[in-house]
Design a protein with these regions (language model features):
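Electropositive, beta-rich accessory/interaction domains or terminal extensions
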Residues: 1-98, 103-105, 137, 148-158
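Short, basic/aromatic beta-hairpin or loop at an interaction surface
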Residues: 64-74, 112-127
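Short, well-structured beta-strand-loop connectors
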Residues: 139-143
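Short, compositionally biased
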Residues: 106-118, 155-158
């Protein structure tokens, strides 16, 4: 099991950028005070959007001016590589919040306001959505424990 860390907690009433907060309450529908602009994004499977700070740094190296929250993620994390974790992975936060990775995030047209090329360049590094399994308070800097999903062998493999 690997450990990650919360670098930034980001919210906005809708749209981007999202603004960093030192701590925030997390409910089943997502982060308190955070809004989603599109009805299709208001689902429990997309309650929280998570992005790796390392992916933002990669994109900065390609000429994009990005900081945590710029691409609309709620949580900017370090040492997780959420884009490569399987769906169903559990993230246990030190203060008790538990999330489950539920859906790969696809680039959206709102990224055009940053740069029209970003939507293409961020494919496969846009982060992941998660559903909330256990509500609580997130605090910037807290650690995250990763629990990979158990994969049982199929009948043909027994």
């Amino acid at each position: 099991m690997s450990k990650g860390q919360v670098i930034s907690i980001n919210v906005s009433p809708g749209g981007i950028p999202k603004i960093s907060q030192p701590m925030i309450r997390v409910g089943i529908e997502g982060l308190e005070g955070d809004g989603h602009n599109h009805e299709k994004q208001r689902t429990p499977l997309q309650a929280v959007c998570i992005q790796d700070v390392e992916k933002l740094e990669e994109l900065k190296g390609e000429g994009y001016s990005l900081v945590p929250g710029t691409t609309g993620e709620n949580l900017t994390v370090q040492n997780l590589n959420v884009n490569n974790l399987p769906l169903g992975t559990i993230l246990r936060f030190a203060n008790g919040v538990v999330l489950e990775l539920s859906k790969v995030r696809k680039p959206c047209y709102v990224l055009d306001s940053i740069n029209p090329r970003l939507k293409e360049d961020i494919v496969n590094r846009c982060g992941t959505y998660a559903k909330v399994l256990c509500e609580g308070v997130l605090i910037q800097g807290e650690s995250i424990q990763v629990v990979l999903p158990v994969v049982l062998p199929s009948e043909g493999e027994l």
